[in-house]
Amino acid sequence: MPLAEKLDRKLRPADDSSDGEDYYEVTDRSSSESILETANANKDDASDDERVKSQMSKVSFGALAKAQDALSKQQSADRKRKRGEDTSKSQDDKLEALRERLRQIKAEKMANGAAGAKPKKKSEGTKKGKVIQDEDDEDDDEEDVDSDNSDTEAAPKARSSKHAPMVQSSKRMVSRKRKVVDVKKPVFRDPRFDNMGGAAPDDNTLGNRYSFLNDYRASEIAELRRTIKKSKNEGEKERLKKQLLSMESQQKARENKEKHQEVIREHKKKEKELVKQGKQPFFLKKSEQKKLALIDRFQNMKSKQLDKVIERRRKKVTSKERRNMPERRTA
């Protein structure tokens, strides 16, 4: 018997009392029956628990895991459904309130238009201001509705065609670095290489002006040769030899260039004399200039030098032909 039923018993005073004091007796006579019923219920519960335990002991762990997964999925789906219902309800309430506000504004606008069908000229400005203000309020409300709709509909607007150009705003953000006053950028000029001081001198003029450099280079080459002979360190000697070879090759290249220029100058002198005689000027191509320089070089060579140059040239040509020769096909 539960505790509440035990406490919910009625008491009344006894009729026969010899000593004038009030005694009370319990009028609830169903206590013994309720106690028996609760004992039987406890026995049934214990037997049910034992039956459930015996059944659970026979269930496999795989079935229990599947049941647990199904319950967890169902609980998560219920939570999502409740959350979605709450958000949709709140959004519907907001939209409904905004629609109601728009209806009221339109009704007020219609009422103002009907009342002011025959207005005076003085009140036209004030009514126009009111109408503009109402329109602004309506636009604001429409913007709010559009913003809510944009929140609900997150999908972007699709283009009319996949070949159509992309839509881009023409509004550009102004940079913080602005030119208030245009200042000319300073231009640095070197008078040696600038045409403002006159035309640039040609190679002959430069060679005549800086001809003393050739004497300096010749003295450096002689000094290098003396240091190579005196030095005993092999590493230092190899480095000096490389430097000497580089300087000698540069000197030879300058001499060849000077000879080439000398041949061209001789040809120009001859052409000037022929032009004075009334003949048409003839300008050599670069290939013809190279041929004349090569002929002059071979004519000024000695026999031994000429043989060496011819042998070197022959080896170069044969190696080039050997490279271009096709390889032999093998099975």
From Swiss-Prot:
Keyword Cell inner membrane listed: no
GO cellular component: 90S preribosome; nucleolus
InterPro entries: RRP36 (IPR009292)
Record field: compositional bias (Basic and acidic residues): 1-15, 42-53, 83-109, 122-133, 180-193, 251-272, 318-331
GO biological process, alphabetically ordered: maturation of SSU-rRNA from tricistronic rRNA transcript (SSU-rRNA, 5.8S rRNA, LSU-rRNA)
Superkingdom field: Eukaryota
Biased segments, Acidic residues type: 16-25, 134-151
Coiled coil: 82-112, 218-277
Keyword field: Coiled coil, Nucleus, Ribonucleoprotein, Ribosome biogenesis, rRNA processing
Transmembrane segments: none
Region (Disordered): 1-207, 247-272, 303-331
Cell compartments where the protein resides: Nucleus, Nucleolus
Amino acid composition bias (Polar residues), ranges on this chain: 32-41
Chief place where the protein resides: nucleus
Function per UniProt: Component of the 90S pre-ribosome involved in the maturation of rRNAs. Required for early cleavages of the pre-RNAs in the 40S ribosomal subunit maturation pathway.
Subunit text: Associates with 90S and pre-40S pre-ribosomal particles.
The family this protein is said to belong to: Belongs to the RRP36 family.
Designated name of the protein: rRNA biogenesis protein RRP36
Gene that this sequence comes from: RRP36
